[in-house]
Amino acid sequence: MAISLATAYISPCFTPESSNSASPSRTLSSVRLPSQIRRFGSVQSPSSSTRFAPLTVRAAKKQTFNSFDDLLQNSDKPVLVDFYATWCGPCQLMVPILNEVSETLKDIIAVVKIDTEKYPSLANKYQIEALPTFILFKDGKLWDRFEGALPANQLVERIENSLQVKQ
């Protein structure tokens, strides 16, 4: 399995078909996965009223690693991993926030996004039961873990406090 690391400038990818109706997913901070999904990694397709544009990464540093463990062990800085799914509303709301956080902390952390549908074995290994789930790794080891969407300033504060970084 090849894992790509991309940092900074992740384009928004959630596009509601109708902008008139308020989406209930916009008020959620995380999505709980049914046990069938956690166990088998299969997911029902989203409703026809929601469309998702593909994630695109612009102006990013891209590296390829043989495995996720290789990525964690060989990173020269802590790695914030965003476990997400394309159908998850709160995950899509985090895209511009992660872009901002990645830019703000570009000298301190690397940001990696892992699609739980494409890599269910990683989701199972790290017991991902809600989306989005963020795991901060330092020196290849799990350092901090939290679930749910956060505003950029709270996410930066959480990361800095966890790493004990003062700007």
Curated annotation (Swiss-Prot):
Its main location: plastid. The keyword Disulfide bond applies. The keyword Iron does not apply. It is found in: Plastid, Chloroplast stroma. CDD domains: TRX_family. Residues 59-164 form the Thioredoxin domain. Disulfide bonds join 88-91. One of its GO terms (cellular component) is nucleus. Keywords: Chloroplast, Disulfide bond, Electron transport, Plastid, Redox-active center, Transit peptide, Transport. Expressed in leaves. One of its GO terms (molecular function) is protein-disulfide reductase activity. SUPFAM superfamilies: Thioredoxin-like. InterPro entries: Thioredoxin (IPR005746), Thioredoxin-like_sf (IPR036249), Thioredoxin_CS (IPR017937), Thioredoxin_domain (IPR013766). The active site is at residues 88, 91. GO terms for biological process: positive regulation of catalytic activity; response to light stimulus. The record marks 89-90 as: Contributes to redox potential value. The record marks 82 as: Deprotonates C-terminal active site Cys. Induction: By light in leaves. Residues 1-58 form a transit peptide. Thiol-disulfide oxidoreductase that poorly activates chloroplastic malate dehydrogenase (NADP-MDH) and fructose-1,6-bisphosphatase. Provides reducing equivalents for peroxiredoxin Q. Belongs to the thioredoxin family. Plant Y-type subfamily. This is Thioredoxin Y2, chloroplastic. It comes from Arabidopsis thaliana.
